[in-house]
Amino acid sequence: MARRSIRTLVLGLASAAAFLFPAASARLAGESAPRTQASAQAPSVVAIRNATLITVSNGTINNGTIVLRDGKIAAIGANVQVPAGATVIDGTGKFVTPGLIDAHSHIGNDAINEGATAVSSMTDMGQVLNPTAIAIQRDLAGGLTTANILHGSANPIGGGSVTIKLRWGVEKGDDLIFEGSMPGIKFALGENPKRQGGGAGGLQGNQSNARYPGTRQGVEYVIRDAFTRAKKYQKDWAAYNAASDKATRIPPRRDLQMDALVEVLEGKRLVHCHSYRADEILMMIRLADEMGFKVATFQHVLEGYKVAKEIAAHGAGASTFSDWWGYKIEAEDAIPGNAGLMTHKGVNVSINSDSAEHARRLNTEAAKSVRWGDITDDQAIGLVTINPAKQLRIDDRVGSLDVGKDADVVIWNNHPLSTFAIVEQTYIDGKVYYDREEDMKRTAEATSSTSDSQPAVTGNLFDIAPEAGKVVFNVNGPTWAITNARIHTVSGPVIPRGTVVIRGNTIQAVGANVSVPSGARVVDARGGNVYPGFIDAQTDLGLNEPGVRNFDDVSEILTFNQMLRTRVAYQSDSDAIAVARTEGITSAGIFPGGGIIGGEVPLMNLDGWTWEENVVRAAAGQAFSFPGGGGGGRGGGGFGGRAGGAGAANSGLRELETLLAQAKVYGQNPNRDMNWSLEPFLPILNKQQAFYISAGNDNAITQAIAWAQRQNVNIVIRTSPMTAVSSAAALKAANVPVIISTVLTLPQGGDNVFHAATYQAPAELEKAGVTFAFSSGGFETVRLIPFQAAMSVAWGLSKERALQAMTLDAAKIFGADKLVGSIEAGKIANLVVTNGDAMEIRSRVLHVVIAGKDVPLQNKQTELFNRYMGRQ
């Protein structure tokens, strides 16, 4: 019944003539209308000419032609004749690849978990497919054509999986299914099926609600017991079917749970096993060997690099994340070189998404393994094409550009492993299911009446407060130089071939004709690039540690925490700090949470023996969650506000206003006794510091700006990219800068919003003249700041402004632009040296300089990579 009602709703939506564009989001709207099977039709013959064809199976063909006929690849090569009557597409400057394949997806599902039982093999994801789910269209826009739709990980043995093609808008869920593909089944190991207190297994709040198992050994037993029963069930049916008197016998009881497991034993159903730790991966290999079946893929497999030899020997594939880590205790030893290391050890590896958002950019997720896994470009593209095709046993149909295979192809405007690559068209079975030009035409129509661009705020946003003087410029330390580099000063023009001289912790000189002092150590950059150190404008790095140490000092319990010196809790030896700084992040705004006022916001360097040595600016202001501002607390998806209705919000503001009024009186008394509840507000009232206001919607931003004007204080807004855009006029008019949460997230506002709205948001802010900075929000993704900038450039932001947003503009937002943010004589020597464009994922960081120190490019993850690469 539920399925029919959902289908009815879906078909009603699909019959609409077009999506409507909300006026408040006109700039970011422009989504295409839902496609029906008819609207996705293409001419029977299509020829793409003069393109770079990345075949995957037979190398790369420059200036080649590929012909699509009747849903298949009919011809491909450098000298292919275009058939008469074919629709010809000029591929000059374009790249063509096979459609991307995601071996772990949950898009287009009405539900993913059946958690009531430890074995739910009787369920099947093919029964709950929604062909008009907007996630399908958004992932098509990223070049995805095939996905393995998996059950969730609530059970040691979960439900059946199904492989689909992303034929968005077909009438029935069954029309998505990849014809002839093998069915699968989801297994799950580790914390998900056993976790206690709100998870799938273990104790569910109290003993009476416990669901077995609650341990890893319990998970192993559930699977072992199920297959023991399945083998007996298989034997009973075999005996019955072979009996000469079968017609008079009573058949064995039909068991839908066992039917699926017998298919596994007979090699008719693929096992896809959710896993994290090396011990549980090895356990599953040994158990599968004992029971007589093969694991098709280990999913997630974050510690697969530790047992790569065993995975390869078993013949299993490994489908992993590119660089996810630290988000749960099982992910503490995850490394971004996992896919590369397993590839080197002979495992068939794919990169998956497990996320409708990550599936939009599987191409650049694969490119990360070039940077961190030491694999080639061809191997990286294989991670999202032929390798998952082999894992799903569909490589005879898709995964490479070969004659006779399905015409699932993608046209890109740049090399698909480039951070700046965008999909132009996506074909499935020779039909166009996504066309960027159509989407951009609609976007242009929606934005035709918008205002002209405005210049951004320039100069210092805030005076530097007295405590910033704790940063000591030391020119008595070692002198060394970086030479033969392309120097991106940010504050001035690029120096094509220049030198930076560093003395102590300070930049002594920079220019094209700078002399290196006698005796100085010289680093020859050999044509590399030198940038100011990158700044993450909001994170809890150093306050929140992943893994077994698992300290969390982000949020205090009071409503007003202005007396808290956040810097004193900064754990300078955090594993997460080293992970971030080796990728060029040299400084970060460290934000506490909790209450209305969370505490002081320091700007900290990412290297130093102690927190004192890490300080750039001890306190740039106070973290302020605007009452009633909405949002969602810690993390990269959005900035939170205080819970409660309008009454609670007004009460909170009134209480803060009372504190500020008291602080004004307090500050006028030269003989005052110290009051730590009022003292921290004095530099804010003197406009030496700012309130960093978290506001989750347009109304909250409008109210926050008006409130700040009444109080005569400086503010910085912290909000999502799309909310910043919809409030851009107000931000510009008040000269209020904004820290945006990650752009690498799904657009807000429902299905009608343009699929790339978050990627485009920084360009819209640039056009509106709003000063902004990028942020991660959490410790796990700090290293991705340059790639947020790159995605924004791909969708319209100028490269100059992108670089500013993660250097000088970020420094201005913290009132620290006289200290960091650009390469100028007299500033702190925070620098990054790369062998290519810093925003390109495949570029490598060669040197990171923090306060004049050439910091070793080592962290826990590089150490694990090197250690296990040496395992024989």
Model-based region annotation:
Residues 10-23:
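Bacterial N-terminal signal peptides
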Residues 112, 118-123, 270, 309-312, ...:
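His/Asp/Glu-enriched, well-ordered alpha-helical/loop segment
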Residues 140-295, 299, 416-418, 422-423, ...:
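Polyanionic/metal-chelating signatures
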Residues 51, 66, 71, 93, ...:
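Divalent metal-coordination and catalytic microenvironments
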Residues 28-43, 444-476:
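N-terminal pre-domain segments of enzymes
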Residues 32-38, 53, 57-97, 491-531:
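Histidine-rich, glycine-flanked metal-binding segment
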Residues 51, 402-445, 485, 824-868:
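C-terminal cap of metal-dependent C-N hydrolases
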